[in-house]
Structures are given as structure tokens and as C-alpha cells.
From Swiss-Prot:
Gene Ontology molecular-function annotations: IMP dehydrogenase activity; metal ion binding; nucleotide binding
HAMAP family for the chain: IMPDH (MF_01964)
Protein's UniProt name: Inosine-5'-monophosphate dehydrogenase
Description of how the protein assembles with itself and partners: Homotetramer.
Positions bound to IMP: 343, 378-380, 401-402, 425-429, 470
Length: 544
């Protein structure tokens, strides 16, 4: 009589040998899930966003700490962390740019301010950390304590070399420090309080040797002089501490200064703006437009390449291969992808133009990769999972606005709304941003019409009598400091890569292209299942 017990174990003669499981796996014609190409077939699946799919897990054979997140923001700029901050006036000024660069990313300073203000912010970023400071701020012997205090108020330090002419490349007479000017009257001459017995390094000298000498002498600053006693450069102890505390900091290899980016428009006046930014030491310029495929941007790229060949150009925004091709052909060093996907953006709703971000990132990044052009996924990044998915789709880095808004380093003051500590966060297409009239020195009718406003320039609406909003203004909760938030993103992304079975961004891209990295579409109920559910109440702590 046949065994009808449903709980009985299967007969051993019907089972395969467990030791051969991997061999039998090869008999399946295809792996679980979908390849990237199958997933992103928009003719079959439509336009997809980050929440519409998942990356399937891979094989783990390494600790998460072994994962490298090094990637390119442009053809020639390598970041240790694939994070950029958005050039929005409630997200990125010099504090954000410094903090993000120290953690391996890149801050893009907004341009909804005067050119002089923007250049000053770039200069503060570039002066924050150095290897050899080849153009140190100097004072002459006739300067006063008040001059030193002014430097401290403006740049945050007061260790200043004193030279015969008050400039580098002249004879070093001494150095003045914070202790020298304490309790001194502002009118006191520097020559009466400066230290004249100065420990120096002799040029030529390696940075390693200079840093070693700085540690041995326990001084705050080490002037480097030539055989004639002329000041050649300066090395600072504060930079040694920054190197120790921020090992992933993104720096220019030659100067050891932090990388800094800034946004500009594509109007004639922006040529003068870029001149000031270049003089301040700008590394990369972002051409800021909601729709980058314009004759204005194409001509501007060509002009920048001729005038400032050492400045990298991130062009955009684009969401199609056709748009990307125009900017790549013009000479762009990187592309910014996204149109209407940001949390404060309503372009798709109002203009009926744009593209779901997942599909846009895949289409543009796949095309641009053939030319070696890195792509930045801009918009729709709400959590670590979105970052991982954007990179899996082919992006080399992500640009974040709302995710970084509300941090200590973002512009603006905290206030309380309905009992929560918040900061203002607004889209550059919002009416509030378009009505901001402090970008340039414009006044009168020009200021009233917002003819020199970054937000209106971004959306090609400077001369419009009626402003049509493509963004909103609101507030976001206090997220604390970048110094805790970015390490949380970094570590979480390392664990995401570990779960996928890849050890680097380049390996992630390679596996996605080859089909070994697999994906799965998510239904609405699958998305619901993947979030917190079934609880009466809960507390969502992101990191500790």
C-alpha cells in the first residue's frame, strides 16, 4: 500500500546528491531574476524608479570593510566616496563642501548669490587643507595686530608669516601666532609681537620630510625657505591632524587641497563668474540647468574647454541618450542625470517632461560609458538603498539634496515646526528661490525682474512676466552633522555591496553589464512587504 502520509520524508532514491548542488545549478538555462538589460527594457516594463526593483543577493566571501567605494565624478577626478552635494541654496555652501570633501565626496557650491560671494566660498574650501601652501597669506612688518585678527575672522586661522614685502617669495622675518596677539591692542605693530626665532625647512624638501620636521619641532606652522631665506611655502600642523582624522578626504593629488566644485549658469555674465571661481582655485564646474540639451550649454562647454582647460566640466541635466550625445560631443567631462525626480521638484507634474530616474540613469550611463564619461545620478536619492541601486544601474556617483538638507553643515538656521527641529529646504524651481534677488549686484528693475537669479536662469525663465514654479519649498528634520551622517551612508553602502557580492563600484558595473548581477521587479505589495509593516508603533533609528 502506498505511503499517503504528507509529512513523510521524500524517498532517498528520488533525491539528488547535495554535494552536487552547484553542478546541478548550471543546468538551469538562466539565473534567478533578471539581467540589467531585461530589467530596464522600458518597452516591456515601462519607466522604473528605484523603488520598482531590487538587486538580488550574491555570494559573500569578504568583510564589508574590504569594499572600496572609490569612483570617478569626472574623467579626471577620483573620489573615495561616490557622494556629491547638490548646488542648492539650502544644501551647499562652503561648510557643506568642506565637510563632504573631508569624508571623500565633493561639494558643489550653489550660485544663487553674487559671484564674489561664491568665489569666497570656493577659496575657503581650497584654503582649508593643504600639503605645501605655496601661496600663504603673509603680512609685512608694518602690519598691525588688527590685521591678524581680521585674517582669523575671515579664514579661521592666525598663524601668519611675516616677510619683508608682506608677500611670499620675499625674505622671512618672523611669524605671528594666536598666542602672540592675545591681549594685544589692535593697533600694536606686528614687528613688536612676532616670533623672530623661527624653525624652518629648507627647499627643496619632500612633504613627508616636512611633516616629520613639523612633528619633531611641535610647532604649529613650518615655513619652507630657499637658500636666500625667502619664503617659498608653508606646512601646517592642522593639516597633519586632518590627514589623520579624515583618511578618505578627496584631495587634488598635487596640492593636497580639498576638491571643490561650484555651479554656474550658461548666460554671458557667467563667464565673469567663472573667472573669479577659477582664480579662487575651482576644480570642477557644474553647468546648472534643468534641461541641459541646449545651444547655450553646448557653446558654453566649448568656451570653457578653450579658456580653462584644467577645469573639469559636469554638464546636464539629461535623461536621454540623445541629450547626452550632444554634451559629450561638446566636451563634457561628466554628466548629471535627472529631470523631475527630486523630492522638491514638480517638473514632471507641471511640464509633463522628464523621465523616471531609474530608467534615465540606466539609459544615459550605458551610453556615456562607451566614451569613458562618468555619470552622476541626481535626484530621487532617499536612502542607502537608492544609492546602491543608482550605482548598480551604471552611475559612478550620486548627487544628494534632500538627503543632506537639514544637516548641521547645510545653510540656514534651525527652527521648530510642530514640535520638530527643522531647517528650510527648497527646490531651485520654487517661487521662493526664483524670488531670491541677492545673486549679483543687481538692483532696481533688474533685481525685481530676477534677471540675475540662479533659479530663473536654471529654468530659462529670467524674462518671464509670470513665474511658473517647477519646485516647492518646505522643511526637513534635523539630521545632525555630516560627520556622523556621511559615515553612516558610507558604511551602509559597503554592506549593500557585500550583500550583492561585489567589492567595488567598478566590479558592480562589470557584473551588471555581464549579467552576473541579477535584479527583480517589485509589485506594489512587494514594496509594502519590504518596508516596516504589522507594527502598532515603532522608532526608526538610522544609525548609532
Amino acid at each position: 500500500m502506498a505511503d499517503t502520509n504528507p509529512n513523510a520524508p521524500p524517498r532517498s532514491d528520488s533525491l539528488l546528491n547535495p554535494a552536487d548542488a552547484l553542478k546541478y545549478l548550471e543546468e538551469y538555462p538562466r539565473g534567478d531574476g533578471l539581467s540589467l538589460q531585461e530589467l530596464m527594457d522600458s518597452r516591456k516594463n515601462g519607466g522604473l524608479t528605484y523603488n520598482d526593483f531590487l538587486v538580488l543577493p550574491g555570494h559573500i566571501s569578504f568583510p564589508a570593510s574590504d569594499v572600496s567605494l572609490q569612483s570617478r565624478a569626472t574623467k579626471n577626478i577620483v573620489l573615495n566616496t561616490p557622494f556629491l552635494s547638490s548646488p542648492m541654496d539650502t544644501v551647499t555652501e562652503d561648510r557643506m563642501a568642506i565637510a563632504l570633501a573631508l569624508h571623500g565626496g565633493l561639494g558643489i557650491i550653489h550660485h544663487n548669490c553674487s559671484a564674489e560671494e561664491q568665489a569666497a566660498m570656493v577659496r575657503r574650501v581650497k584654503k582649508y587643507e593643504n600639503g605645501f601652501i605655496t601661496d600663504p597669506l603673509c603680512l609685512g612688518p608694518d602690519a598691525t595686530v588688527g590685521d591678524v585678527l581680521e585674517i582669523k575672522a575671515k579664514f579661521g586661522f592666525c598663524g601668519v608669516p611675516i616677510t619683508e614685502t608682506g608677500a611670499p617669495n620675499s625674505k622671512l622675518l618672523g611669524i605671528v601666532t594666536g598666542r602672540d596677539v592675545q591681549f594685544q591692542d589692535a593697533e600694536t605693530p606686528i614687528k613688536s609681537v612676532m616670533t623672530t626665532e623661527v624653525v624652518t625647512g629648507s627647499s627643496p624638501i619632500t612633504l613627508e620630510k616636512a611633516n616629520s620636521l613639523l612633528r619633531e619641532t611641535k610647532k604649529g606652522k613650518l615655513p619652507i625657505v630657499d637658500s636666500n631665506g625667502h619664503l617659498v611655502s608653508l606646512v601646517a600642523r592642522s593639516d597633519l591632524l586632518k590627514n589623520q582624522n579624515y583618511p578618505y578626504a578627496s584631495k587634488v593629488p598635487e596640492s593636497k587641497q580639498l576638491y571643490c566644485g561650484a555651479a554656474i549658469g550658461t548666460r554671458p555674465g557667467d563667464k565673469d563668474r567663472l573667472k573669479l571661481l577659477a582664480e579662487a582655485g575651482l576644480d570642477v564646474v557644474v553647468l546648472d540647468s534643468s534641461q541641459g540639451d541646449s545651444v547655450y550649454q553646448i557653446e558654453f562647454i566649448k568656451w570653457i574647454k578653450q579658456t580653462y582647460p584644467k577645469i573639469e566640466i559636469i554638464a546636464g541635466n539629461v535623461v536621454t541618450r540623445e541629450q547626452a550625445a550632444q554634451l559629450i560631443a561638446a566636451g563634457a567631462d561628466g554628466l548629471r542625470i535627472g529631470m523631475g525626480s527630486g523630492s522638491i521638484c514638480i517638473t514632471q507634474e507641471v511640464m509633463a517632461v522628464g523621465r523616471p530616474q531609474g530608467t534615465a540613469v540606466y539609459a544615459v550611463a550605458e551610453f556615456a560609458s562607451r566614451f569613458g564619461i562618468p555619470c552622476i545620478a541626481d535626484g530621487g536619492i532617499g536612502n542607502i538603498g537608492h544609492i546602491a541601486k543608482a550605482l548598480a544601474l551604471g552611475a559612478s556617483a550620486v548627487m544628494m539634496g534632500g538627503l543632506l538638507a537639514g544637516t548641521t553643515e547645510s545653510p540656514g538656521e534651525y527652527f521648530y515646526h510642530e514640535g520638530k527641529r527643522v531647517k528650510v529646504y527648497r527646490g531651485m524651481g520654487s517661487i521662493e528661490a526664483m524670488e531670491h534677488t541677492q545673486r549679483g549686484s543687481a538692483s532696481g528693475k533688474r533685481s525685481i525682474l530676477n534677471l540675475d537669479n540662479a533659479a530663473t536662469a536654471r529654468y530659462f525663465s529670467e524674462a518671464d512676466a509670470v513665474k511658473v514654479a517647477q519646485g516647492v519649498s518646505g522643511d526637513v528634520a534635523d539630521k545632525g552633522s555630516i560627520n556622523k551622517f556621511v559615515p553612516y551612508l558610507f558604511t551602509g553602502l559597503q554592506h549593500s555591496f557585500q550583500d550583492a557580492g561585489v567589492k567595488s563600484v567598478s566590479e558592480l558595473h562589470s557584473c551588471a553589464r555581464s549579467g552576473s548581477l541579477r535584479f527583480e521587479l517589485r509589485t506594489a505589495s512587494a514594496q509594502l512587504e519590504g518596508g516596516v509593516h504589522g507594527l502598532n508603533s515603532y522608532t526608526k533609528r538610522l544609525f548609532a
